[in-house]
Amino acid sequence: MTRSDATTVTVQRDVPFQEVGDEVLHLDLYEATATNGPKPMAVLVRGGGFAVGDKGEFARHAIDLAEAGYLVVEPQYRLAPAWTFPAPLVDVKAAVEWCRAEGEAYGGDPTRVVAAGHSAGANLVVLAAATADDPAFEPDLYPGTSSALSAVAGYAGVYDFRAFARLDETEHDVDTHAQYLGGTPGEVPEAYELASPVAQADVSMPSTLLLHGRDDAVIPPQQTALMAEALGPLTAVEHDVVPGGHAFPFNGAFYDDVYERTVRFFDQHAGAGPGSDAGHGVSGPPDGGSTPR
């Protein structure tokens, strides 16, 4: 699937998808009017240290993916310190389940859902893939609806909070992680493990794309290397350290390469159509062996 200059993308903003107490979360929905359904769906999750920001960060990516034939959603999620782990993870899973339960009405294919995230968002989408259908982290939105993904992409993510906490705090501030996880590693070690995709990934992981900027001064590229190493025996993984800093996916000098690699990866694993071998639960580890899911 490729972008088309002649394609018009429509955006439906603030579609409610998750209600927690008195708080209603919304998503933005991007659809290309010139493309025919059913379309694979993509969930894009922004960063912000689990504490700041709102949907809209991925607007350019969403428009381009919509032009390439995807139905794209960019959801809100709950933020620290008002909400701690696993609240944001549950919200991302709710967005995935919304795609599966409601996406067909918008021209989406509920059997093909992918996700990409940056920074904190990368942690959330990769962790969502690693804990797919785990009752401990599933929303109450659509009981019985799967939160599994066909493929996932993480940009500049933190994937092992335990290793991150051991870094020199003068170089890498871990206070926001303690705020999100509810304390220090000594106080809540279980949260640091449960929130780390490195510790949660198993053979149910879908194919995964991991990119990290070589000059990232916020999250060290070693975090992505740890994730790639953990996934190596489990699933197909594409890992690369690319030019740029922490915000490389949004930098105009590097944007086209990131977009093209991502859409090519998603097309390979979710763009083949319903009933194909693309997606969660079918493809095995890189050696081509048959692995039960």
Q: Where on the chain are the PLM-derived regions?
A:
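Alpha/beta-hydrolase superfamily serine-hydrolase fold, recognizing
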Residues: 1-293
